[in-house]
């Protein structure tokens, strides 16, 4: 039974990731005053299926000088971790109701760095290695602010269980009292998922495609699916943290519909940002984090810690 539950979670995630590629190409197309994919199937709806078939029937070529085991393990690990991070998400019921769901998600996102590092190093290509080093530095750096923002939000919620956030936000969305945190969180999720304008790992003019430059066919498709699964997961996480949906136990489908609409709108915002903004320089990316976001998030975290004490209130009870 548990295996059926897992499959019921994994298959829709992979399908959503596949169709997100189509949505992205369509959105970018219309924003650049062109049509986007419109040949394969009605309105190009079968394009992701055609892409998947093409990628998986191609021969997965491997550079002769690459490290075999790591080269193959890296994309499997990337997709495995991307899917694992969905386990504690309340939709409205999580797959496994964890006591420390938020910590689990932080740990899994930290492990994702290894798949990037392995792929860059095992490819035995200077472009892949430079791309991987950039990606690792960027991911590790932005995880610092993500963790502090999460801590601040959890201080208002009072529990590391994600389901508690639904109860906390029955009165008001946390985006209202914590809007500076929400803005910094959203920008940090863009950087964490290596999306434009922070997609320095795949600066086409410099590094061709970044850490996955030597990958082709199936393994490349695994990286691709991992990236899009992470994008959807991050937006769902944002919706849970700051735009909490109230859950009526008698009609759980209302929660799901509401939650999906919010996540979709946030995902569309990701695509809109990609169509609008140019890429940052690498030093600007690091300055934004270490000189702007980190001091601000630390100050706001201290503020949220001291607020209940100052107002003689009690901290949130779980």
From Swiss-Prot:
GO cellular component: mitochondrial inner membrane
Keyword Translocase (UniProt): yes
Predominant place of localization: mitochondrion
Membrane topology: Multi-pass membrane protein
Membrane-spanning residues: 2-22, 70-90, 100-120, 147-167, 172-192, 222-242, 253-273, 294-314
Segments forming a coiled coil: none
Gene Ontology molecular function, alphabetical: NADH dehydrogenase (ubiquinone) activity
Reactions it catalyzes: a ubiquinone + NADH + 5 H(+)(in) = a ubiquinol + NAD(+) + 4 H(+)(out)
Entry's localization field: Mitochondrion inner membrane
Enzyme class: translocase
EC number: 7.1.1.2
Oligomeric form and interacting partners: Core subunit of respiratory chain NADH dehydrogenase (Complex I) which is composed of 45 different subunits.
Family recorded in the similarity comment: Belongs to the complex I subunit 1 family.
Cited function: Core subunit of the mitochondrial membrane respiratory chain NADH dehydrogenase (Complex I) which catalyzes electron transfer from NADH through the respiratory chain, using ubiquinone as an electron acceptor. Essential for the catalytic activity and assembly of complex I.
Protein name: NADH-ubiquinone oxidoreductase chain 1
Name of the gene: MT-ND1
């Amino acid at each position: 039974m548990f295996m059926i539950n897992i499959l019921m979670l994994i298959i829709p995630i992979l399908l959503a990731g596949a169709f997100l590629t189509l949505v992205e190409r369509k959105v970018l197309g219309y924003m650049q005053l062109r049509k986007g994919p419109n040949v394969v199937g009605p309105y190009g709806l079968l394009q992701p299926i055609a892409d998947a078939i093409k990628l998986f029937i191609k021969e997965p070529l491997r550079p002769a000088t690459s490290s075999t085991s790591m080269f193959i393990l890296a994309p499997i690990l990337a997709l495995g971790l991307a899917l694992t991070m969905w386990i504690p998400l309340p939709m409205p019921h999580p797959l496994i109701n964890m006591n420390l769901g938020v910590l689990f998600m932080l740990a899994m996102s930290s492990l994702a760095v290894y798949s990037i590092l392995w792929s860059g190093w095992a490819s035995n290509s200077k472009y892949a290695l430079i791309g991987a080093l950039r990606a690792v530095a960027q991911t590790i750096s932005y995880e610092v602010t993500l963790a502090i923002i999460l801590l601040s939000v959890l201080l208002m919620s009072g529990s590391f269980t994600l389901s508690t956030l639904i109860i906390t936000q029955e009165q008001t969305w946390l985006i209202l009292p914590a809007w500076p945190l929400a803005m910094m969180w959203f920008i940090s999720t863009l950087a964490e998922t290596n999306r434009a304008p922070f997609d320095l790992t795949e600066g086409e003019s410099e590094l061709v495609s970044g850490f996955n430059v030597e990958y082709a066919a199936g393994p490349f498709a695994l990286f691709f699916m991992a990236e899009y699964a992470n994008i959807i997961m991050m937006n769902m996480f944002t919706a849970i943290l700051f735009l909490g949906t109230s859950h009526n136990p008698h009609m759980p489908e209302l929660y799901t519909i509401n939650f999906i609409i919010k996540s979709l709108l946030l995902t569309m915002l990701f695509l809109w940002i990609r169509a609008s903004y140019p890429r940052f320089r690498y030093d600007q990316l690091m300055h934004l984090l270490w000189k702007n976001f980190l001091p601000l998030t630390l100050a706001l975290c201290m503020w949220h810690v001291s607020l209940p004490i100052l107002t003689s209130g009690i901290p949130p009870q779980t």
